[in-house]
A protein has these predicted regions:
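Conserved P-loop NTPase motor core of helicases/translocases
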Residues: 82, 179-181, 224, 232-314, ...
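Conserved helicase motor core of SF1/SF2 NTP-dependent helicases
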Residues: 229, 237-241, 296-299, 309-313, ...
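Conserved lysine of the Walker
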Residues: 215
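Charged, low-complexity interaction regions that mediate assembly/partner binding
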Residues: 1-67, 81-84
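Hydrophobic positions on the alpha1 helix immediately C-terminal to the Walker A/P-loop
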Residues: 218, 222
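Pre-ATPase regulatory/linker segments immediately N-terminal to the P-loop/RecA-like helicase/translocase core
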Residues: 2-15, 59-200, 256-264, 274
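Pre-Walker A (Motif I) flank of P-loop NTPase domains
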Residues: 200-207, 231, 288
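Walker A (P-loop) phosphate-binding loop of P-loop NTPases
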Residues: 212
Length: 409
């Protein structure tokens, strides 16, 4: 089974269209209609930035953002901060005239001393955006429907158009056969040392980690060891939460204190959680340093690379959530690659429906991790000791892993 570059590109194009179809209607809609008619756009005044949250005051004359709703927060040009000046402007027009913007999520509502207004708290606001608006207390902010993650798809499309990068071709152009091998079970007491030694023997390997087997701890320990040897390391994951879990592990405490751990797109709540985590606007390999970045940003770095393999090691966490092309991006970025995931977890969530995936034969391009494991092209190692369950629960969970799990007593 082999995919042409056109097949790779077409899958990403179809997914891109599916993701943007509904959003495009809103993006081209009059902003006043979204504000007054559908209640999908909101205008508020910054009150404070406190304890990792952004507090904004909204009028009770219109609907408020719903708790749990993800929104794009925009700082517009001075004239457009007054919605009465919007006229026929569309959401797209406002977006083009933003000074800065950040993703945000509504987390609470509260009454205001002035009964005509309500206070709303937001988290996940980027640190650079928060620092900019903090300079102008009381500034007017506009909240709009969040953009779908189209940059991820666009970055991967650029990558699949590259045909002269051997490391990328080793994933995208490979002839995959269903040739599953038995996972090599890791029974060593020092799993991080075992994985480290195996990584020295191959330039790419897969680590299968059932629930509670210490994948995050292992990644942190491995990063600390590699960086202590002067290596440059990139860890990429689907979510910022996974990256923050890694940053919070004890193995990285010394590196954090010495300002050797960096993360892209740090939010104010992440900064509150880990004040020693260094913000970095662009990915750049540095000796003895660890960089944490999501697939969305790391894929852009890979697409921009003119010279491949800048990092000594790239570790992909949450690999079961990665599209096949993202594995190619990792190969382009790192001399050595470690993919960490669990084939029993959910495959990547895509907007294309099942019929379209089946008709286009896109299944393996969606579930890249399972294809990599089943093909037998790379050595696969499995963690066997679970720290989350007793033996009885480990036995039940182990039914999905050929009865290989044992509880850590």
């Amino acid at each position: 089974m082999q995919f042409t570059r056109q097949q790779h590109w077409q899958f990403l194009e179809d997914e891109l269209k599916a993701e943007t179809e509904e959003y495009k209607k809103k993006f081209l809609s009059p902003a006043m209609s979204l504000l007054k008619d559908s209640g999908e756009m909101f205008v508020g005044q910054l009150v404070a930035l406190k304890d990792g949250e952004m507090i904004v005051r909204f009028s009770n004359n219109r609907s408020l953002p719903r708790k749990g709703e993800f929104l794009l927060c925009m700082l517009l040009q001075q004239e457009l901060r007054n919605y009465r000046n919007w006229g026929d402007c569309t959401y797209r027009d406002l977006y083009k005239n933003r000074y800065n913007a950040s993703d945000s999520v509504c987390i609470w509502h509260s009454a205001s001393p002035d009964k005509e207004y309500s206070l709303v708290g937001f988290s996940r606001v980027s640190l650079d955006f928060a620092q900019q608006v903090a300079e102008t207390p009381g500034v007017i902010l506009v909240f709009a429907p969040q953009r779908p993650p189209i940059d991820y798809m666009l970055n991967l499309q650029r990558l699949v158009r590259e045909e002269l990068t051997p490391s990328l071709s080793s994933v995208l152009d490979a002839n995959y056969q269903c040739n599953p091998q038995s996972n090599s079970l890791i029974k060593s007491e020092d799993t991080a040392d075992y994985v480290y030694k195996q990584l020295l023997l191959t330039n790419s390997m897969i680590l299968q980690g059932p629930p509670g087997t210490g994948k995050t701890y292992l990644i942190a320990e491995l990063c600390a060891r590699l960086c202590s040897e002067g290596k440059s390391v990139l860890v990429t994951a689907m979510t910022n939460r996974a990256l923050m879990e890694i940053a919070g592990k004890p193995a990285l405490s010394q590196m954090l204190q010495s300002e050797h751990v960096f993360k892209t797109n740090i939010t104010i709540d992440e900064h509150k959680e880990n004040k020693h985590l260094e913000p970095i606007s662009h990915i750049s390999p540095m000796p003895s340093c660890l960089i944490l970045s999501t697939y969305y940003i790391a894929s852009g770095f890979a697409a921009e690379l003119s010279l491949p393999l800048p990092f000594d090691c790239v570790i992909m966490d949450e690999a079961s959530q990665a599209l096949l092309a993202m594995f190619g991006a990792c190969k382009k970025m790192g001399k050595r690659c470690l993919w960490v995931g669990d084939t029993k977890q959910l495959a990547p969530i895509v907007s294309l429906n099942r019929d379209r995936i089946r008709f286009g034969e896109y299944g393996h391009m969606v579930d890249g991790f399972n294809l990599m494991v089943e093909s037998g092209k790379y050595p696969v190692f499995q963690l066997t000791k679970t720290y989350r369950f007793g033996q009885r629960a480990a036995d039940y969970t182990g039914l999905f892993y050929n009865n290989t799990l044992i509880a850590n007593h």
